[in-house]
Amino acid sequence: MFNRKLMECSDDEFVRGSQCDEEDEEEQQRQSSQRPPFYENMRTFAPSHMHISCHYDIPYPPHLIQPPVCGVSTFTYAREFPVSNSQQFFNVTPPQQQQQQGTGGSGEEDYCIPKSEDRDHSSNYSQVATKQDRPFVFFASDCQSPLEIVGEVYCTVPGRTSLLSSTTKYRVTVAEIQRRISPPECLNASLLGGILRKAKSKDGGKTLRDSLKKLGLTLPAGRRKQANVTAWTALVEEEAIHMAKEFALVCEKEFHSREIGIYLTKTSLAIDPDVVKRRTALEMSRKVVGELAELLSCDRTPLTPYFPRNMLPIDPSVQQHLSHFTLMTHGFGNVAMSAVLESVKLMIDESIKYIDRCCSQNVWR
């Protein structure tokens, strides 16, 4: 049927139809060349020494972690990315168009997409992409390797809690800087420069912002900090977590739970000799402490990988508060609280054992 109609049409109509088809193809090619750039890599950010387990069934707070996509809100790249299922997760809007620069340019508006020959010379072109209000830590199935870019180290800083004879240098990753300039801390250039041990200079803030801008991080000029400065503000995450692990080890080995539990039990029974009442109170206390410890083990903040994680679901509103505490203490809070609660449970267990061992069996009949 198509061949018959083609034979019936005149030569002029055939030429005009061919020209229309060529114009349509040129229009499609022009539109495809102006297609907005997508992310070349969708990143998961956490310190390089941590293991992050990606589970899509984990409820994350909307402002912190939001599966199943992954990336950073201000980490934007203007490189070509093949069309995939990731488009449904990103509400990408066309960036501002720029005039083509250089000799031989047509002057038409187009997106600043780097050419293949310029891949190795990133300084020769400008990277233009949109910035979306996305959570700063999230996961995706499109990631080639969750730890592929996690270990990007921005710099190393000397520890603030080390002795002069054994100064330890801690790594500061790009992910940590993103967390520090994001809520709840929202550090400004002055505080961030002090944490990174950058020397104060006339253009120190501008230099820091420019270096972060090359990594895709945006640090606004003149911003004010939102959270109060504490002793943990001066620590980097790796040092804070190192302190937490040492604190947990000291609690396990140096906190004498047995002796303290027996002493408290003797003191309480000397005031009120009701053994049944005392044992019931200890059982209820242990239950409450266990519930709190189980809740902390459900924390899904990326800075809490050093204790076994409970896979029970957790309410997003509660996860938001746990993440706030963990981010304010840079990973120290959750680990330290878990260590303290474990010591308290051991103390309660020793108190119950002492009551069962030393008190008369007639009491329980």
UniProtKB/Swiss-Prot annotation:
It comes from the Eukaryota. The keyword Ribonucleoprotein does not apply. Residues 223-356 are annotated as: H-S-H (helix-span-helix), dimerization. Disruption phenotype: Animals develop with normal speed and go normally through the molt. They stop feeding for a normal time before each molt, but average nose speed is reduced by only about 10% and unlike wild-type, they are never immobile. The command interneurons AVA and AVE, which control backward movement, are not shut down during sleep-like behavior. Optogenetic channelrhodopsin activation of AIBs, RIBs and RIS interneurons during wake-like behavior using blue light does not trigger acute immobility and cessation of pumping in L1 larvae, instead it causes an increase in mobility. Transmembrane segments: none annotated. GO terms for biological process: positive regulation of transcription by RNA polymerase II; regulation of cell population proliferation; sleep. One of its GO terms (molecular function) is RNA polymerase II transcription regulatory region sequence-specific DNA binding. Transcription factor, which is required in the single sleep-active ring interneuron RIS for sleep-like behavioral quiescence induced by neuropeptide signaling in larvae. Regulates gene expression of sleep-inducing FMRFamide-like neuropeptide flp-11 in RIS. Belongs to the AP-2 family. This is Transcription factor aptf-1. The gene is aptf-1.
